[in-house]
Amino acid sequence: MALFSVLSNALSELPVSIWLAAAATFAVYHAIRAVYLIFFSPLAIFPGSPWAALGEYWEAYWNIGVRPGHKGQTLFKLEQMHKRLGPALRMGPNEVHIYDPAFYHELYRPGSRYYKDPSMHKVLGAPTSTLAESDPVRHKQRKAPLEPLFSKKNILSLENMLMEHVDHCCQRFDELYSQGKPVSMEWALKSLAMDMVSQFAFGQSLNAIADPEFKSLPVRVFQQYLPSLHVIKAFPFVRLLSSLPLWIARRISHSVEMGHELEQFAARRIDEYIEAAAQGKTPNFPTVMERLLIPIPEKGYEVPDKQGLRDEILTLISAGDDTTGIANTVTLFNIIHNRTIHDRLLAELKTVMPTPTSHAQYIQLEQLPYLTAVIKEGLRYSSPAASRTPRLVPPGGVRLPDGRFIPAGTRVGMAIYHIHYNEGLFENPHEFDPERWLQGPEITAKRAKFLVPFSRGSRSCLGINLAYMEMYMAIAYIVRRFDLELVGTTPEDMKWDDMVVPQFHGEFRALTKRRVD
């Protein structure tokens, strides 16, 4: 306190002229910087908002808000601007956003020289995870224990475990129907995804489905934390507050509080797993934690420290909970809302599940053409990881087809949503239409090239096989077992804001009556 008092007194005794000079210097510096960035920067050739050229202000303006439709709008604003101004826009002082589908496979192809920007994950969290690793050699080493685990062969071995969670979910639907209560489908399907991915991660599920309203703490925390990343990206100093004790963080920032909750949740689960493993208590199927704790010297993999393990688990559960839950939510709503789609899908499901209590193997479900078309359309339409995923332009820069040059080190990105809703690739993109995936092998293959919900290349989502199995099983069994009736939910409720993952404007509620035939 004495030091603070001395500094305060010293500053107060400075002449007014010095303060005025400092203020003038500050103003002149930022004025010169603004003129340079807007008119003379190498990126000044790209159109866009002048505010975007100066910093995060433009993006923050469109993304940070409270009311539905007044937050998370950058994604949609970019779409409008691209249609007016062309395929490349100024997105920041050192960032260009691209809207050209052909460039997507250059940017995200296997062996791409466009590396991840490490500064992004330092701000957004989990900086020591495999997901955040920007160096391709280290990234390959970090993936070594996980790639075999997420292979289709290994994921197929999880079918019985996943089926137990589907059965538990259906049991909860029965309980609520017997009480005359509708199911909040978004929360239920996110809880189902949470139980599946947490058991795969730790060998023991979080039992989120058992929560009376499907709003267990882990599901709520992830639901509330991800949208706060817009605030953290715009104001990185908020991330620094995470070092404060939780009781202080609660009083300062809800975003920081949620971040604390997530870190403590992951740390507890890791400690519990390590303690159980030391006592010889391990599950009878391979888990993520088990593989992460085994070094692979020949592939350069070393066991991460506690922070590294925590970051891996947080990214795994975040990627496997919200995204799959959202894809299932959007898909199921559109099945119920469109009776033609519903009836055709139900008829096909009856060919492998003659009664509502029948079971079908996952490999049987995969072979159903209309179910497969519904799943693909659900992934396109929901675009659960919709936002742009920036990369850094490699040494030498890149010249776009129109001749404009982007210097090396520039951040450049594209959004999955803009691919999935591109009218040149998908006719009537705002219509949920499974038929677009049943128009012959040549057309379907062309469209499949641009179905990229899991991204592409060496940095694509490891969990693709798990996500597909979860979706096939959840959609097939819920539709076959229940005659679902919407309760007040309309397409307006299913509109969404891009809060890192889609955040719906309303609630998807349905009565879950068991079928008798």
Swiss-Prot record:
Binding site for heme: 461
The keyword Chloroplast is annotated on this UniProt entry: no
Keyword field contains Heme: yes
Name of the molecule in the record: Cytochrome P450 monooxygenase yanH
Lineage per the UniProt record: Eukaryota, Fungi, Dikarya, Ascomycota, Pezizomycotina
Pathway: Secondary metabolite biosynthesis; terpenoid biosynthesis
InterPro entries in the record: Cyt_P450, Cyt_P450_CS, Cyt_P450_E_grp-I, Cyt_P450_sf, Cytochrome_P450_monoxygenase
Residue positions the entry lists as glycosylated: 338
Catalytic EC class: oxidoreductase
Role summary: Cytochrome P450 monooxygenase; part of the gene cluster that mediates the biosynthesis of yanuthone D, a fungal isoprenoid epoxycyclohexenone that acts as an antibiotic against fungi and bacteria. The first step of the pathway is the synthesis of 6-methylsalicylic acid (6-MSA) by the polyketide synthase yanA. 6-MSA is then converted to m-cresol by the decarboxylase yanB. The cytochrome P450 monooxygenase yanC then catalyzes the oxidation of m-cresol to toluquinol.
Keywords from the UniProt entry: Glycoprotein, Heme, Iron, Metal-binding, Monooxygenase, Oxidoreductase, Signal
Organism of this sequence: Aspergillus niger (strain ATCC 1015 / CBS 113.46 / FGSC A1144 / LSHB Ac4 / NCTC 3858a / NRRL 328 / USDA 3528.7)
PANTHER family xrefs: CYTOCHROME P450 (PTHR24305), N-ACETYLTRYPTOPHAN 6-HYDROXYLASE IVOC-RELATED (PTHR24305:SF157)
Cofactor: heme
